[in-house]
């Protein structure tokens, strides 16, 4: 099974995927490691179907080049975990092509999740997380809006959730 988790910055995608990882043990690919810099949302989104989950590639050739945010350049190759279950999270994760690739390598078992949260709370979370984000907030929000307009991920997903500040599950 493959889960693609999408949503705007600060909505709780990473928190949600971390909780799923702690419960299920599934590996997580964070698109934050794939974005080639602050203007790279669309490129990272395309990489999901092109290299990370591409069913036309042999399993051992799937993966991505990690972006080194400090050096502002690509770093090492990171192979896609060979496990049958996987989480890909980040803005840009859900597109028709990405869902199709996930379904192809996940034997049809792929699901999309949209994480929704109000702008004020998202902004506060993002600023608390990264001191350098404020200067990029507007540019990044524009890329998110372009992704949403082009791919309409909110309509493609199977579930829409709201991740509160404290996420507590009892299973």
Language-model segments: residues:
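Hydrophobic anchor at the beta1->P-loop junction of P-loop NTPases
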Residues: 5
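P-loop (Walker A) phosphate-binding loop of NTP-binding proteins
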Residues: 8
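Conserved lysine of the Walker
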Residues: 13
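Hydrophobic positions on the alpha1 helix immediately C-terminal to the Walker A/P-loop
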Residues: 16
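Post-Walker A helix-loop "phosphate-sensing" segment adjacent to the P-loop in P-loop NTPases
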Residues: 21-29
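Conserved nucleotide-sensing/catalytic segment adjacent to the nucleotide-binding pocket
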Residues: 27, 33-88
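ATP-dependent NMP and nucleoside kinases share a basic, alpha-helical "lid"
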Residues: 52, 76-129
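Small-molecule kinase domains that catalyze NTP-dependent phosphoryl transfer to phosphate-bearing small molecules
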Residues: 101, 131-171
């Amino acid at each position: 099974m493959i889960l693609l988790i999408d949503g705007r910055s600060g909505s709780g995608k990473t928190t949600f995927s971390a909780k799923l990882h702690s419960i299920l043990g599934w590996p997580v690919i964070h698109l934050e490691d794939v974005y080639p810099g602050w203007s790279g949302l669309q490129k990272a989104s395309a990489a999901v179907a092109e290299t990370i989950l591409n069913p036309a590639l042999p399993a051992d050739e799937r993966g991505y080049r990690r972006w080194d945010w400090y050096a502002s350049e690509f770093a090492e190759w990171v192979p896609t975990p060979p496990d049958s279950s996987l989480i890909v999270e980040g803005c840009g994760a859900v597109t028709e092509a990405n869902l199709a690739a996930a379904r192809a390598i996940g034997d049809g078992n792929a699901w999309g999740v949209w994480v929704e949260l109000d702008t004020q709370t998202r902004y506060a979370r993002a600023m608390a997380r990264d001191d350098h984000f404020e200067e990029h907030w507007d540019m990044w929000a524009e890329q998110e809006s372009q992704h949403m307009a082009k791919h309409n991920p909110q309509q493609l997903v199977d579930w829409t959730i709201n991740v509160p500040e404290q996420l507590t599950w009892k299973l």
